[in-house]
Amino acid sequence: GLLDYDIFIANPDGSELRNLTNSPGSYDAEATISPDGESIVFTSTRDGDLDIYVMDADGGNVRRLTDEPGYDGGAFFSPDGTKIVYRAYHPTDPDELAEFRALLADGLVKPSRVEIFIMDADGSNKKQLTNNGAANFAPFFHPDGKRIIFSSNMHDPRGRSFNLYMIDVDGSNLQRLTHHDGFDSFPMFSPDGKKLVFGSDRNASDE
C-alpha cells in the first residue's frame, strides 16, 4: 500500500545517498527532476490526499501544486521546465469520492478512470487534455514541448489493452501510435526525439 515511502537522491554510482523528504507515514514517491536539475516534482499524501508537490533539489522549499480531491501523480517537466504534465483521477460522485478516501486511509487506490492534465510549473493554468473516461496514464513530453505521449486503453471496450497515443498540449490532434493487443506503456523519448523507449508485454510468452 501507500504507507511510508520517501524520496532519495544519490550519485549515479550510488554514493552520497540522501533522504530528501523524511516524512514518516506519508507516501512520497513518483519523483522526477526538472531539466535544469534544480527542482523535483513528486506525489505525496502528506496533506491527506494524493497531490503533486515540487521541491528544490536539496529537499527544501516544498510547495503543493494540486489540491483537487483524488489522485494526482506521474508528473514530468516539459523540456524547457515551464510546464508539468501529469495524470489524475478526480472522483466527483459523492459515493465514489467516499470510497476513494476510505481506500486511501488504508494505503490503497483503485482508480479506473484517469485523465491527462498539464499545468504551469508553479501549479497555475491547469488544463485537462483527455476526457474519454478511460485509463490514460504515463504521460511524457515530446522533446519539442508541443506534444504529449501517453498510454491508454481508450480503444478497448474491455479496458485490457493499452496502447501509446500522442496529443498536442492544447488537447487537439490525438493520434494512436501503437496497435497491440496487450500492454504498451511508460513511454519516454530520447532528448533528440529520434528514439522512443517504452514497456511492453509483446514479447512475453503465454506460459
For every predicted segment, state its role.
Residues 142, 157-159, 188-191, 204:
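A structural signal for short secondary-structure junctions
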Residues 1-7, 19-28, 43-52, 66-72, ...:
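A flexible loop/linker signature enriched in serine peptidases of the S9 family
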Residues 11-15, 56-60, 120-124, 168-172:
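Short loop/turn segments that connect beta-strands within beta-propeller blades
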